[in-house]
Every structure is written in C-alpha cells, then in structure tokens.
C-alpha cells in the first residue's frame, strides 16, 4: 500500500472496529479513508430507525445528537485505522464538541455522508473536524475531541 492507503470497509468490517450495535450503530459503510488524515463514511437513514417513532411522529427528523454520534463513530474508525493498536479491550469516548452547527434537517430516505478530518493527536486525545452532508449540502458540522481508553480503566 502507498502513503494514501485508500480502502472501502463494509458493515462486517465496521462491526469488527466499533463496539456499537443496533440500534446505535450509525455507520453503514466506509467509502474512503487515509490513515492519520481523513475518512468518508455513509449512514443510510430509513423510516425504520427507532428514533423516528418519537422525533417527530408527523414530521420525522433525525435528531441532531445522533448526527453527531454518526460523525463520532466515523471518527472512531479513522482513529482505529490510524494506529497500530488493537481495538481489543479499547473504547473510543467523546470528551467534547465545539462549534456544533445544524444546517439542514435529515429525513428518512436521506443518505448521510460523513466526513471527518484529523486535526491533531496527542497521547490518548484525538481532535477532529466532522461534517455531515445530504445530497452535497452541509447538514451538520462540529469539532470533536475523543479519547481512546482501556475498558478495564473505566
């Protein structure tokens, strides 16, 4: 592989990288990533999502906090693919979000494209810029900070 190792990850591979499971796994596919730099992933939003039962029954809109979680999960995959460390016994935890903006509602049937770019990494902390798009239009954005922790230290 060259310096810009481009790959595609399907749901089976994602399940091996993230601890999340239904109904909280919010990344369906990774379209592209460059270790230590960036990732592009997808969440296909369907009317079958459990959160649409109450948010909102007559006008279903994906909750903004779940858009942020989808970005965080994409960022978690980027972190895992950017280190030589095994994911066994590790958790990727949000430690902060800044400059959060919701620009466009996300509806059932939308394909949420998740872009994360690594800004910096120091010890166990990772800072990323995340942007979520629907049909090429910015739906949400944030700067996110996360930590990689050992499960036994929790």
Swiss-Prot record:
It catalyses: a (3R)-hydroxyacyl-[ACP] = a (2E)-enoyl-[ACP] + H2O. The keyword Lipid biosynthesis applies. It is found in: Cytoplasm. It holds the Pfam family FabA. One of its GO terms (cellular component) is cytoplasm. It is an enzyme of class 4 (lyase). It comes from the Bacteria. The keyword Cytoplasm applies. CDD domains: FabZ. InterPro entries: FabA_FabZ, FabZ, HotDog_dom_sf. Keywords: Cytoplasm, Lipid A biosynthesis, Lipid biosynthesis, Lipid metabolism, Lyase. One of its GO terms (biological process) is lipid A biosynthetic process. Its EC number is 4.2.1.59. The active site is at residue 55. GO terms for molecular function: (3R)-hydroxyacyl-[acyl-carrier-protein] dehydratase activity. Involved in unsaturated fatty acids biosynthesis. Catalyzes the dehydration of short chain beta-hydroxyacyl-ACPs and long chain saturated and unsaturated beta-hydroxyacyl-ACPs. Belongs to the thioester dehydratase family. FabZ subfamily. NCBIfam families: fabZ, PRK00006.1. This is 3-hydroxyacyl-[acyl-carrier-protein] dehydratase FabZ. It comes from Oleidesulfovibrio alaskensis (strain ATCC BAA-1058 / DSM 17464 / G20). The lineage of its organism: Bacteria, Pseudomonadati, Thermodesulfobacteriota, Desulfovibrionia, Desulfovibrionales.
